[in-house]
A protein has these predicted regions:
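A generic "binding-loop/recognition-motif" signal
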Residues: 31, 52, 98
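Flexible, polar/low-complexity N-terminal or interdomain linker segments that lie immediately upstream
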Residues: 1-37, 111-114
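Alpha-helical scaffolding within the catalytic cores
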Residues: 49-56
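Conserved beta-strand scaffold positions in the cores of enzyme catalytic domains, especially
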Residues: 26, 44-46, 92-94
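Short, structured coil segments at secondary-structure junctions
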Residues: 40-42, 88
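Glycine-rich nucleotide phosphate-binding loop and flanking beta-alpha elements
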Residues: 33, 53, 73
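Catalytic cysteine-centered active loop of the rhodanese-like fold, especially the PTP/DSP P-loop
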Residues: 56-102
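Short, hinge-like loop/turn segments at secondary-structure boundaries
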Residues: 43-45, 109-113
Length: 114
């Protein structure tokens, strides 16, 4: 797995892809930030970053999985995206700037599930 196997999505590009109906699926992999937040990216699925290996299989096939976190340098997102790629998911990406960039830009959020 190389860094260039993981696409980098700017928040503006992910927001535009939603409007165009592109086959993308945001995946929230925040840890403490998730517990402390009451919101997530609109239509995001959630996997626990401490248990991601067992939860990746439950994510939809046929869509590019866009992982986001709130760690500097997308550290958690990149780790999980690289693992997913190495384990058969050919379309993976990370949201540049993660949750904070998405929220700061004012893009759609929703109450987190559960």
């Amino acid at each position: 797995m190389a860094w260039d196997d993981v696409s980098r999505w700017q928040p503006v590009d992910l927001a535009a892809s939603f409007k165009m109906g592109d086959a993308v699926q945001p995946v929230d992999v925040r840890d403490i930030g998730y517990r402390e937040s009451d919101a997530q990216v609109k239509n995001a699925l959630r996997i626990d970053p401490m248990e991601f290996e067992s939860q990746i299989a439950g994510l939809p096939e046929g869509k590019e999985l866009i992982f986001y976190c709130d760690r500097p340098g997308e550290a958690t997102s990149l780790k999980i995206a690289m693992w997913a790629f190495d384990n058969g998911r050919s379309r993976v990406g990370v949201l540049v700037g993660g949750w904070n960039a998405w929220q700061d830009a004012g893009y759609p959020v929703e109450p987190k599930a559960g």
